[in-house]
Amino acid sequence: MILLQQVWLPLPNRPSTSPPMSVAARSTRTLQLPPQKAFGQEASLPLAGEEDLAKRGEPDSALEELCKPLFCKLCNVTLNSAQQAQAHYQGKNHGKKLRNYYAANSCPPPARVSSVVAEPVATPLVPVPPQVGSCKPGGRVILATENDYCKLCDASFSSPAVAQAHYQGKNHAKRLRLAEAQSHSFSDSAEAGQRRTRKEGSEFKMVATRRNMNPVQSNSGPYFNARSRQRIPRDLAMCVTPSGQFYCSMCNVGAGEEVEFRQHLESKQHKSKVSEQRYRSEMENLGYVQ
């Protein structure tokens, strides 16, 4: 028992013994090396993130210029109100074009991502921005309806609600009134042109005097009547000139044929002149002479 106590008692004093200083120094040196490497790696990561953010910030600023509150230059759509703008920017067509825009302006992705990103760009149904020249147009044709496109205003819509809001807006109503006014003015000008041709052909057309083919009678004198052998009506006897042409002194209009001269006598111009002459003569008879 005594021997055991002597052996057991020195045992608690052993932990006070420390290892040599060289061993502690080695352990600390080995522990200090990995944090330095990790610290260098961690310091390089934020720099790479800032570069990526700087690269992504450029297309975002350009995108703000394309997507205005009332005009989407990316989709070439004019918006009339805030509700219509919200419906357009939340629509599928704008989302597809937005994805294509990011795919066209983003940094060159790795080989695996390029195959995935290239698929939506090459789809024939989605129109590609003019910056991307590698996309080929598809052979499928989609017919646009009133809910998709307004030919009068040259505007496309992403949903029927947006189309209905456009057709009820002020811009569409203004364009519609202008189109109707232009169509009415064109029809009025066409009718006026037809009336002018009729008047020129019937009332105001001067017929050239026909010369007599007989050389003996043509030299018979200045008062030779070419219609001497023809029967001249009594009511038109005072309207025939010595050269054989019918003449209206009131309207200062001449005609070579009896039919054309009678058409002039039945025209509105001649009748208005006659009524004006009668009114003047009546006023002169009554003593109202200016």
UniProtKB/Swiss-Prot annotation:
InterPro entries: Matrin/U1-like-C_Znf_C2H2 (IPR003604), ZMAT3 (IPR052644), Znf_C2H2_jaz (IPR022755), Znf_C2H2_sf (IPR036236), Znf_C2H2_type (IPR013087). Constitutively expressed in brain and testis. Also expressed in lung, kidney and spleen after whole body gamma irradiation. The keyword DNA damage applies. GO terms for cellular component: nucleolus. GO terms for biological process: apoptotic process; DNA damage response; negative regulation of cell growth; protein transport. Pfam families: zf-C2H2_jaz, zf-met. A zinc finger (Matrin-type) spans 70-100, 148-178, 246-276. SUPFAM superfamilies: beta-beta-alpha zinc fingers (SSF57667). The keyword DNA-binding does not apply. Induction: By DNA damage in a p53-dependent manner, and by methamphetamine (METH) in a catecholaminergic cell line. Its main location: nucleus. Acts as a bona fide target gene of p53/TP53. May play a role in the TP53-dependent growth regulatory pathway. May contribute to TP53-mediated apoptosis by regulation of TP53 expression and translocation to the nucleus and nucleolus. Interacts with dsRNA. This is Zinc finger matrin-type protein 3. The lineage of its organism: Eukaryota, Metazoa, Chordata, Craniata, Vertebrata.
